[in-house]
């Protein structure tokens, strides 16, 4: 992770994450911040940034998570359903999450899975209207009403 003065979208600097080619492409890097959710309770917040990539093999993207005081995840999006791969020019990306009343902590950043380079610039965290759809990745499970096949014969 470093500051880059040459590859920028706007202004004088961008941030760069880089993972060198290695035999195991299962590593990841993240640049993140974590802060108190109190100021944002009952709001819909959008994390947006301009992202540029070079030879990203696995994926990269923004991510945001909202936790309660027990560190349970209330809202989450890591763009895994809309991954950025390969080599791409500057483009704007965003994640949008609701900040429920019981929220305590907001974590957010950019993630690089596998090898490649990613630059991020012009990051914004803004309150948006409810007509902007949430990108929350549902963590709900569809549970059965009762146990089944306890004899393993069905």
Provide a role label for each language-model segment.
Residues 1-154:
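Extracellular and organelle-lumenal recognition/adhesion modules and their flexible linkers in secreted
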């Amino acid at each position: 992770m470093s500051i880059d003065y040459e590859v920028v979208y706007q202004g004088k600097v961008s941030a760069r994450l880089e993972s060198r080619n290695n035999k195991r492409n299962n590593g990841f890097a993240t640049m993140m911040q974590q802060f108190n959710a109190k100021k944002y309770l009952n709001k819909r917040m959008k994390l947006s940034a301009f992202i540029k990539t070079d030879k990203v093999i696995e994926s990269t993207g923004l991510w945001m998570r909202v936790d309660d005081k027990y560190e349970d995840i209330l809202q989450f999006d890591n763009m895994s359903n809309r991954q950025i791969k390969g080599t791409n020019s500057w483009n704007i990306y965003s994640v949008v999450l609701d900040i429920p009343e019981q929220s305590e902590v907001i974590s957010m950043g950019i993630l690089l899975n596998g090898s490649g380079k990613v630059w991020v610039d012009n990051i914004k965290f803004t309150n948006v209207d409810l007509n902007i759809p949430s990108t929350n990745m549902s963590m709900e499970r569809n549970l059965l009403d009762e146990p089944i096949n306890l004899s393993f014969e069905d």
